[in-house]
Amino acid sequence: MGTPLEDVTGRMPDVEIRQEAGILAPASRVQVLLALTGIILPVLALSMEEGFAISAVPRAVASLNGFNRYAWPSTSFLLTSTVAMPVFAKLSDLYGRKWFYLFSVVSSIAYPLLCGSAGTLPIPLDGMNQIILAAGFLGLAHGGIMVLSFTLVADLFPPSERGRYQGILAAVTTLPFTIGPSLGGWITDHWSWRWAFYVNVPLGVMAIAVVYFALPGTRRRLARSSIDWAGIATLLGWLVPLLLALTWVGQSSWSAPRIRALLIASAVLLPIFLLVEKYAVEPIVLLTLFRNRRITLVSLNIFLMGIGLYGISVYLPLDLQGVVGASAAKSGAVFGLYAFSVVAANLVSGRLLSRAARNQFLAIGGSGLTATGLFLLSRMDSSTTQPEILLCAILSGVGFGVLMPTYEVLVQNAAPAEAMGVATGVTQFLRSVGGAIGLALFSTMLLRIYHSHVDHLIPKGAPAPLRQAFDNPLQLAFNRPHLASAVSQIANGESLLRNLFQGSRAGFLSAMHFIFLISAAALAASCVLNLFLGGTPSQKGPRRPL
């Protein structure tokens, strides 16, 4: 027999949004706990999929002979996730969160199913293109789940309690990355890379059921409910060419015709997008939000945070293996401790946000800690030890863990209730754009700095395997036995190989200096901007019976 909160179908009933407060009402303790479970479980399932993929995707790419398209899954993910965030945010403001959240969770199930079956599906795509397609579904799911989960928390709790639960949600987002890569690697090694994807399907199915039955629906009472299709089209029109150009420039140059064409298309369509949004009835990006000085400053900070966050997340393992010479297992352990520091800081800062007199101080402290940790990473050299790198990474992780829920709460407390979804979507959107731009810059500079140290060391007429091996530095550790055989017939071959490996390490070190220094500069600029946030007290509001 169901509780009074359930309808005859066993589902939680629809509830109305109190526009003046932005919270779900009415809500008992049971309903709030069930709704919170419905919010958190999809985030956990999604993060587990992404954590396992860190170890499984490289093996899948090798198995499917797709190394020449190695970057395309990441590109597909960034494209769909970045575009999905503002679109889902706006549509959820118009028609309610639940069904768009459920659609996002269903999309997340497509990823492990498609990846696990890649190369065997009866569709007109080869195995690698099936992985790329699956990454697009993952990006769609990521964009929807990330923006809607944080918005649902803002709907469910008053401003005075949001910080605590935003911190919990941010921790759930990060926690699987402390164990996911190592567990996914173990499954890949002992079973197969396909099972590293399939193992996540049951949790995803459970998440679908919990969202459907436990998460309340919302009935929006809006005088108008038009969809900004022109805004969606022009958003895709300027953003997709920009991200493609930033992704491909590392493989060519800024003067390449296709890069120029993409950048010109993006530059032409961006002002058209802004013009469309200015006059749209229900815009995807509510430009009037940026009349609020605090939202504008926090949005800039989130963009800068995205540069540093993606920089350390992608290049810390490469730094450990390429510069310090750590094994993959030790590199994974360091990354896991870094991720754990983010989780711990999420939880602590979430509670502090509910008690702090001025959240501005948390933003200043978090950006300052992160900038310091990244700057120290930029000063390392070949004698730097793994514990020293770990200490710097943890310092950065604590800073990021403080910033994530702090920025979310600052924006949500400043935004009107009817624009809560759009405001939250803008923050997630800008973080992804910052990360995409940062990674494109870092990828380009990594290759250029690396080759400036290595190319002049390779003699003319060198065996093709030698030249090809050093054109692909990420595979050097695996190719070293074959390279020794390749240079055995060259005069001073052993000395040449030793010099090449030294040059490769020096190139990596110089590139890491650049990457972490730019990341530190972005967070230092963010710290300065945080000084101008002004008084940002933790707002009070009606409390939930928790």
Predicted features and spans:
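Hydrophobic transmembrane-helix bundles of small-molecule transporters
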Residues: W186-N301, G308, A326, V334, ...
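Transmembrane alpha-helical cores of Major Facilitator Superfamily
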Residues: L44, T75-L79, V106, G167-L175, ...
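Transmembrane core module of solute transporters
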Residues: A35-A84, S192, A230, P257-I259, ...
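A membrane-interface helix-boundary motif in multi-pass transporters
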Residues: D189-V201, W248-I259, R448-A520
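Interfacial helix-cap and linker-helix signal at transmembrane-aqueous boundaries
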Residues: A60-V61, L91-S92, L183-W191, L246, ...
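C-terminal module of multi-pass small-molecule transporters
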Residues: A84, A89, G96-S107, M128-Q130, ...
